[in-house]
Amino acid sequence: MSRIGKKPVQVPAGITATVDGQKVTAKGPKGELFFVANDEISLKLENNAVVVTPVNQTKDARSKWGMSRTMIEGIFKGVKDGFERKLEINGVGYRAAMQGKNLQLALGFSHDVIYEPPVGISIVVPKPTEIVVSGINKQQVGQVAAEIREYRGPEPYKGKGVKYADERIVRKEGKKK
């Protein structure tokens, strides 16, 4: 069984972290984030590191132990460097453009798809076939990228659609005569 929770989370330079009961708050150059741990997890700030321990040894507490540590590590990385997810668009006539702060996607429908990003997420279109989603909250960045990909996911025959930049599409062979 993994024991990733045993390792304390080091507070990176340039970030101030505070622990108040079950709440960890991190302030950094990119902004401020917090994480509220479950009641079965105890948090302490010792030697510029957050120590995560389960209150008791129940299966439920142990299962939330490693997840809590990873979430705290994620908020530290978010306020220091931020997160980004790159998307690629493949297909004839498929393209993206910014329309104010909204993302306009031409994906082969009879209409253009307009996506309004939530607060705290920035979307950049360096090329008409590339989209970069960035922000400080890892979950929110991944969710926005998944919502954009969902409009026209990649299909296995020609590879047309919106895919993650690091995603490999398993291609299928067409029908034979």
From Swiss-Prot:
SUPFAM superfamilies cross-referenced by the UniProt entry: Ribosomal protein L6
Keyword rRNA-binding (UniProt): yes
GO cellular component, one term: cytosolic large ribosomal subunit
UniProt cross-references to InterPro entries, sorted A to Z: Ribosomal_uL6-like (IPR000702), Ribosomal_uL6-like_a/b-dom_sf (IPR036789), Ribosomal_uL6_a/b-dom (IPR020040), Ribosomal_uL6_bac-type (IPR019906), Ribosomal_uL6_CS (IPR002358)
Assigned keywords, A-Z: Ribonucleoprotein, Ribosomal protein, RNA-binding, rRNA-binding
Keyword Ribosomal protein: yes
Pfam families assigned: Ribosomal_L6 (PF00347)
GO MF entry, a single one: rRNA binding
Its job: This protein binds to the 23S rRNA, and is important in its secondary structure. It is located near the subunit interface in the base of the L7/L12 stalk, and near the tRNA binding site of the peptidyltransferase center.
Family from the record: Belongs to the universal ribosomal protein uL6 family.
Protein name per Swiss-Prot or TrEMBL: Large ribosomal subunit protein uL6
Source organism (scientific name): Rhizobium johnstonii (strain DSM 114642 / LMG 32736 / 3841) (Rhizobium leguminosarum bv. viciae)
